[in-house]
Curated annotation (Swiss-Prot):
Domain ABC transporter: 3-246
GO annotation, cellular component aspect: ATP-binding cassette (ABC) transporter complex
Subunit structure: Forms a stable energy-coupling factor (ECF) transporter complex composed of 2 membrane-embedded substrate-binding proteins (S component), 2 ATP-binding proteins (A component) and 2 transmembrane proteins (T component).
Name listed for the protein in its UniProt record: Energy-coupling factor transporter ATP-binding protein EcfA2
Gene: ecfA2
Organism: Bacillus anthracis
High-level lineage: Bacteria, Bacillati, Bacillota, Bacilli, Bacillales
Length: 293
């Protein structure tokens, strides 16, 4: 299910003295089945942008097309319920949205709300909890007896139980330790590969953006500043730093090595493994090449 933003603008508290423009002239497409990252400094418009994907927000100007659904300025999309089934959104700290007395009831809430029978919803709950790496035995427990990491996985299972075609992740690893972050990101990538899900990741973690995303969209002051593959985007390191976007650690180490040893590493290395390989290659050639990154 392809997603397209066409000249999208969004203003909060439109036509009031408190009006504030959050998005403008946003033109971007997310073809079906891809893995995408949206990055940018705090306040750049990332979260506002993704709230247009299932109709939580409506454009002030322009159109957002999600498959056969069109959300346009001044026009109400009548079929938001099926759209919200197709586009699953995992917001920051989703475990705060848990409320039922058992894990099973919490995961079943979404499917039953969309008309699925109780028996079918329970089956979806069993499948979803295994997808997120938890044991089915947890279904009978209160979600509030679980660890923070388990609660987050339960909340994500609730989204997956609705069998979305698009999975939108807004800082999904916020507050987790490094091990938990890595496990969750690997889980999302596995779901993307095995289920063919379109994944749109909003993140401040540049390592995750570089590692998983096929395309990266850089937002700045409410509009698209840059778009391309990880290699293309992070080759603009100076411009990114000027607008407050962090760089992957491998690029920071690359700069430090260049300055310390007086060598030039042409490639925009996106992992420590790549950096090690490139340093070896440069040293073998004598250590002096023009730096184009």
């Amino acid at each position: 299910m392809e997603i397209t933003f066409q000249k999208v603008e969004h203003r909060y508290q439109y036509k009031t003295p408190f009006e504030r423009r959050a998005l403008y002239d946003v033109d971007v497409s997310f073809p079906s089945g891809g893995y995408y990252a949206i990055i940018g400094h705090t306040g750049s418009g990332k979260s506002t942008m993704i709230q247009h994907l299932n109709g939580l927000l409506q454009p002030t100007n322009g159109t957002v097309q999600i498959g056969e659904h069109f959300i346009s300025a001044g026009k109400k999309e009548k079929k938001l319920k099926p759209l919200r089934k197709k586009v699953g959104v995992v917001f920051q700290f989703p475990e705060h949205q848990l409320f039922e007395e058992t894990v099973e009831k919490d995961i079943c809430f979404g499917p039953t709300n969309f008309g699925v029978s109780e028996e079918a919803a329970k089956q979806k709950a069993r499948e979803a909890i295994e997808l997120v790496g938890l044991e089915p035995e947890l279904l009978a427990r209160s979600p509030f007896e679980l660890s923070g990491g388990q609660m987050r996985r339960v909340a994500i299972a609730g989204v997956l139980a609705m069998e979305p075609e698009v999975l939108v992740l807004d800082e999904p690893t916020a507050g987790l330790d490094p091990k938990g972050q890595n496990e969750l990101m690997e889980m999302f990538y596995k779901l993307h590969k095995e289920k063919g899900l379109t994944v749109i990741l909003v993140t401040h973690n540049m390592e995750d953006a570089a590692k998983y995303a096929e395309q990266i969209v850089v937002m700045h002051k409410g509009t698209v500043f840059l778009q391309g593959s990880a290699e293309e985007v992070f080759s603009h390191a100076d411009e990114l730093e000027k607008i407050g976007v962090d760089l992957p650690m491998s690029l920071k180490y690359k700069r430090a090595i260049e300055e310390k040893f007086g060598i030039s590493i042409p490639k925009a290395t996106l992992s420590l493994e790549d950096l090690t390989h490139e340093v070896v290659q440069v040293l073998r050639k004598g250590g002096h090449e023009s730096c184009s990154s």
